[in-house]
Amino acid sequence: MFRAIPFTATVHPYAITAPRLVVKMSAIATKNTRVESLEVKPPAHPTYDLKEVMQLALSEDAGNLGDVTCKATIPLDMESDAHFLAKEDGIVAGIALAEMIFAEVDPSLKVEWYVNDGDKVHKGLKFGKVQGNAYNIVIAERVVLNFMQRMSGIATLTKEMADAAHPAYILETRKTAPGLRLVDKWAVLIGGGKNHRMGLFDMVMIKDNHISAAGGVGKALKSVDQYLEQNKLQIGVEVETRTIEEVREVLEYASQTKTSLTRIMLDNMVVPLSNGDIDVSMLKEAVELINGRFDTEASGNVTLETVHKIGQTGVTYISSGALTHSVKALDISLKIDTELALEVGRRTKRA
């Protein structure tokens, strides 16, 4: 059972006062039977270990002394129930991760859910219960809620945008919380979106800085094609375009050269108008010009209010950094059964 810090940790060499414990991140793929059975699994990553991210979150909360408040107020042998309560409407996400955290803190805790990841919850709904040692439930509480509230907020916004964007697919970006890339992108999947590239390693994405450094769109594409051929890499290639002229340049290159290009980003071709509406005529022209030869991705000025109109242009994907970089957490709480706690407290003369 979890008490202070049951994790492999090292004392930071420059700590002057109380030692700060640092958990080293592992480059081992997560192996978890609960994950393998999930309907919506976390996206794959070659160096990201989900278990160690959970351990890091617990370790930073526990510090070097553990939960001093729990030690002072909760009997170590106290058993209780605690209920998950939705305090606003939304899409719940992070249920599977919450189970893993509870199991990491105390494998004897029993967790029961009345909904699944991706289900709609309404304000006032009790949607889950955890039973067992009250001390360990409270230790896990904040870490569980931090993950669930953030993931549920992402899933809720993703669901709204994915529904509005249809028939286009909604994507997130790499604008995620540091260290939580996989968790954020997992929440997008739970909300009904699709994942963009995980990082710098799994897709070539030629953006404005690459184009400027290479000397133009055509030269950048040629360099990428040569690099992939020389290194025998087969991965997706996307190029950013900002004007119709750049779209034409990409299409001209592709018509004359065998290329690995798979997707064209149409960046900031959605123009905001003074009346609050948007002009999508440039985006629509670009999509018609490409004419299905490559997948297309609209980026820039994408909001919940604009995404439907963008989705009607025929674009394949719509990407939005707002799904993860400025998400509003869904308000969820975990409350111990007061009557049961008081009854136990009376028996132990602590109430």
Curated annotation (Swiss-Prot):
Pfam families referenced in this protein's UniProt entry, alphabetically: QRPTase_C, QRPTase_N
Binding site for substrate: 142, 173-175, 197, 207, 240, 267, 299-301, 320-322
Pathway(s) the chain acts in: Alkaloid biosynthesis; nicotine biosynthesis; Cofactor biosynthesis; NAD(+) biosynthesis; nicotinate D-ribonucleotide from quinolinate: step 1/1
Entry's EC annotation: 2.4.2.19
GO cellular component: mitochondrion
Factors inducing expression: Induced by wounding.
GO process terms (BP): alkaloid metabolic process; NAD biosynthetic process; nicotine biosynthetic process; quinolinate catabolic process; response to wounding
One function term, GO molecular function aspect: nicotinate-nucleotide diphosphorylase (carboxylating) activity
InterPro entries noted in UniProt: Aldolase_TIM, NadC, NadC/ModD, Nicotinate_pribotase-like_C, Quinolinate_PRibosylTase_N_sf, Quinolinate_PRibosylTrfase_C, Quinolinate_PRibosylTrfase_N
Subcellular location: Mitochondrion
Keywords: Alkaloid metabolism, Glycosyltransferase, Mitochondrion, Pyridine nucleotide biosynthesis, Transferase, Transit peptide
Family as reported in the entry's similarity comment: Belongs to the NadC/ModD family.
Primary role: Involved in the biosynthesis of pyridine alkaloid natural products, leading mainly to the production of anabasine, anatabine, nicotine and nornicotine, effective deterrents against herbivores with antiparasitic and pesticide properties (neurotoxins); nornicotine serves as the precursor in the synthesis of the carcinogen compound N'-nitrosonornicotine (NNN). Involved in the catabolism of quinolinic acid (QA).
PANTHER family attached to this UniProt entry: NICOTINATE-NUCLEOTIDE PYROPHOSPHORYLASE [CARBOXYLATING]
Name the record gives this protein: Quinolinate phosphoribosyltransferase [decarboxylating] 2, mitochondrial
Species for this entry: Nicotiana glauca (Glaucous tobacco)
Gene: QPT2
